[in-house]
Amino acid sequence: MRTILNSILLMSLCSSATAPAMAINRANYDKKDANIHEEEASDSTRHQPLTESSVKLNEVVVTGLTGSQKLKQSPAPISFVSARQLEMQPSTNIIDAIAHQPGVSQITTGSGISKPVIRGLGYNRVVVVNDGIRQEGQQWGDEHGIEIAPASVHSVEILKGPASLMYGSDAMAGVLIFHSAPTLAKGDMRANFSTGYQTNNGLFDYSLNFAGNQGGFVWNTRYSGKMAHAYKNKYDGYVFGSSLREQAFSQLLGWNYRQGHSHLTLDYYHLTPGIVEGERDEKTGELEVPDGYDAKSYGKPMPYQQIHHYKAVLNNSWFLGDGNLKLLLGYQQNRRQEFEEEENPKECGLDFMLHTMNYDLHYLSPEMNGWKFSTGINGMWQQSINKGSEFLIPAYHLFDYGVFATMSKEIGKLNLSGGIRYDHRHLHSEALREEDDADSHSSDLNGSGLNAHESNDSFRFQAFKRSFEGVTGSIGLAYEILPDFNLKLNLARGFRAPNISELSSNGVHEGTQRYELGNTSLKPENSWQFDLGMDYSSPIISAELSLFANRINHYIYSEKLADENDQPVLINDTPAYQFTSGDARILGGEASIDIHPVEHLHFGNTFSYVNSVQLHQPSESKYLPFTPAPRWVSDVRYEFVCDGKTFDHLFVKLQMDCNLRQNHYFAVNDTETATPSYTLLNMYAGTDVKLHGKRLLSLYLSGENLTNRAYQNHLSRLKYLDVNQVTGRRGVYNMGRNFSIKIVVPIEL
């Protein structure tokens, strides 16, 4: 599962046809050291000169749907985000850092919590891969993000569209692959320090890194931290409950040898975000805050969450003749707690403990008559335990496996690839009886409705067992029509088993402002998606067009419940929602063009559009929930200095981020509402500072939402909080004007 980067070189070049940082496939310009270990090659040639023909993004080696291949040879749509791009982009979390990419959005809960969305699909439809294994941390929840520290990410691959072939259930929308930095060449030792500050919420972050390779023994140690007080905007002022604190530690230890490598990675991640409830004073309309509340405090306001994530991954790769055998074993422990009682601040309400064991074994066979084959098996075992005094989902056990085979062949200018996979998942949910609990409620297990008058001696959760299976695959081609013009076609089938929340949730908590009810009769989702892609590059223009059509059967979503008088059903004074399903069709695509008429000047434009329709439904339920609005991003970038004596890559960029009005929303019982359009003006600048020909530090400055525009993104969950009775505006608005500074200091030892 782990990407075979096979020697990626990250470097900065000032060229009219390229971005300031590119990942280059070393094999295209230097084959004399072909026996160098793949992990060392990227660094052992870091400072070697490249020819101009090498510096093309299409030469990046990516995972793809069928194994390692050049980006231009992958028929499926893939985006690559380099280390330099991540450095330059101010953000509050790793999903926020990549949400500017075409086709990628984020469901947000305030400024610090983001869930990834790819082409209108999110939650358990996006698989996140980190350290080679899929990240498992209660993805069904809205109110917490991805347990990955931004400082630990070196580059990102974004696979758009069904990727169940390699990653199994849940990869309906695509996959986010977060890569750590490659190990260094023998004899190298390096350190790195970075820090940053943002003015709106006082966000302060830092990262320390030390890596090396002595005689094949490799290590990479990183510690990072972050803290932020409440953010502010023009309408709400400081938003109580939006503060956060983050700490992360990672340690890689391993051995590189001629026949392969063995690496052990240990990760710890701790996040303490507040919970925005959005309650308002009816007379003033202002957000309610506790007495003596300091909006700029970095402390933990009540209520708040606490997330601990531990991970251990053993990554082995062995070269067997011309073949390659890979084995990954992983363990993850995720614990999420919610604290909400002022009287008992150490007593948590919800307390989830999730244990996950990951395994992945696959073999890449030697090339035979131009054909490349790989086969493998991967999956996971899970156990979830309820340790708190409140309950939302039952305790459960899960085991799944998937067996797959892939192939690819290059025939002149034509590249063919495809594969097939079988998945099986078994879920066993445990019963929970609550006695004398007036707050316990049950839903009909067949999803037919709500029974709010259950006896006090009742089951909160009924025990059940479900098994799901599916056959998926993909077939595609990439054809080089001209040296700088490529055509891509791909057809893929996706599969997703319902998650535990969709099947059997029965409860409410501070983070969602919803009482959610599951439905054990739900069927697995399956989809067919067709992709058409074209890209063109020249010294003056670079352009790309990617179109898709996706048909999903048994698409699962939640809808707001109403009584016979069309009034919202309330449980414990909280609106009730229940999961249901239907068939859906999603159409859309992304277009980008970068015009650079003169050296150092770039005029870029990207446009993303998604139209998500539920088939055979009336107008109020025609559109799927959480569909991102059409988005147009335009920027002008000028590089003033390239490879100067003191400054390098000195640039300024002006950006217009235009989100169009979203009139396509799921309107049943006011589950969603329309979202007005808005435009944000941003400005970015940066440079490398050199001393004696070497990079001393990198400095980045930015100003986002320069006009301090008050807006709500359509995917903001805070949009549906309390109504301001004074102004009539509903919910909490997104962050206002924000300036930031970031400094990165590399240290060669």
Feature names for model-found ranges:
Residues 133-160:
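Short acidic/polar hinge/loop motifs at secondary-structure boundaries
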Residues 137-139, 152-154, 165-235, 242-249, ...:
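Outer-membrane beta-barrel translocator/receptor signature
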Residues 548-551, 569-662:
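Gram-negative outer-membrane beta-barrel transporters
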Residues 553-554, 558, 660-665, 687-749:
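C-terminal beta-signal and adjacent terminal beta-strands/loops
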